[in-house]
């Protein structure tokens, strides 16, 4: 770590930048796999590079946060800001996501339990296969689910701030006052959906690796992930 400081004991920002440039590509590749093919890797790299520059410029070691942790927050935050500014999620996808969440909420209230895929599909008036495709189409928009939550419930619920960006919407919720409510909601999910969230967000397995654990394909994992997040939003939205 000494190579990151000048002879005067001042942090060498250029050396810090050079050492952590590979982190930008790592985070960009991790994010790209969750996005439509239309999102270019170069755009993510450029935004992430700006995030790293901001991290280098604003990092204060005296605050006690490791630079890697701080840099990852800045890099990911910059990439997500870039995606939000482009509003890449089609309106039809957002509409479908809302309709699925609404159907789930209505059924859960009526049944007193988690609704099955067949029940949700019937409520929407579509075949199960079409419902599963809808889950696939809407899964990518889950990156911004916490933004939609904030819009629905107001700024009094601080899920995301510039200084405290986290890596995913689930972690955003777990860092706030909603932690216990989120944990209770997760525990009420179907077992396979709980497992998907645990493997994806805590163990950081990718879709292919989770598929191997569950003995299903990547598309099925994506569907389960999408369905789990929608259930969480529905459960939390009632409270």
UniProtKB/Swiss-Prot annotation:
Keywords: Cytoplasm, DNA-binding, Sigma factor, Transcription, Transcription regulation, Virulence
Subcellular location: Cytoplasm
Pfam families on file: Sigma70_r2 (PF04542), Sigma70_r3 (PF04539), Sigma70_r4 (PF04545)
GO terms for biological process, alphabetical: DNA-templated transcription initiation; regulation of DNA-templated transcription
MF terms (GO), sorted A to Z: DNA binding; DNA-directed RNA polymerase activity; sigma factor activity
Sequence segments annotated as region (Sigma-70 factor domain-4): 185-233
Xref: InterPro entries: RNA_pol_sigma-70_dom, RNA_pol_sigma70, RNA_pol_sigma70_r2, RNA_pol_sigma70_r3, RNA_pol_sigma70_r4, RNA_pol_sigma_FliA_WhiG, RNA_pol_sigma_r2, RNA_pol_sigma_r3/r4-like
Source organism, top-level taxon: Bacteria
Chain segments carrying region Sigma-70 factor domain-2: 16-88
Primary localisation category: cytoplasm
Short motif Interaction with polymerase core subunit RpoC, span: 43-46
Biological function: Sigma factors are initiation factors that promote the attachment of RNA polymerase to specific initiation sites and are then released. This sigma factor controls the expression of flagella-related genes. May regulate the expression of genes involved in virulence.
Protein name: RNA polymerase sigma factor FliA
Source species: Salmonella typhimurium (strain LT2 / SGSC1412 / ATCC 700720)
Lineage of source species: Bacteria, Pseudomonadati, Pseudomonadota, Gammaproteobacteria, Enterobacterales
């Amino acid at each position: 770590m000494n190579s990151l400081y000048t002879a005067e004991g001042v942090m060498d920002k250029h050396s810090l930048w050079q050492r952590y440039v590979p982190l930008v590509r790592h985070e960009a590749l991790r994010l790209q796999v969750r996005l439509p093919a239309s999102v270019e890797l170069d755009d993510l790299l450029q935004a992430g590079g700006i995030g790293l520059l901001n991290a280098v410029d604003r990092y204060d070691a005296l605050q006690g946060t490791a630079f890697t942790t701080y840099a990852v927050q800045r890099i990911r935050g910059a990439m997500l800001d870039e995606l939000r500014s482009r509003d890449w999620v089609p309106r039809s996808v957002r509409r479908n996501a809302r309709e699925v969440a609404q159907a789930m909420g209505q059924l859960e209230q009526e049944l007193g339990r988690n609704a099955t895929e067949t029940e949700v599909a019937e409520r929407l008036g579509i075949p199960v296969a079409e419902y599963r495709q809808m889950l696939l189409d809407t899964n990518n928009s889950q990156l911004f689910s916490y933004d939609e939550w904030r819009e629905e419930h107001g700024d009094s619920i601080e899920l995301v701030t510039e200084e405290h960006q986290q890596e995913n919407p689930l972690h955003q919720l777990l860092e706030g006052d909603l932690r216990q409510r989120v944990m209770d909601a997760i525990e009420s999910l179907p077992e396979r959906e709980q497992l998907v969230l645990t493997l994806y967000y805590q163990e950081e397995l990718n879709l292919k690796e989770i598929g191997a654990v569950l003995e299903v394909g990547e598309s099925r994992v994506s569907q389960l992930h999408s369905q789990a997040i929608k259930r969480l939003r529905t459960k939390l939205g009632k409270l």
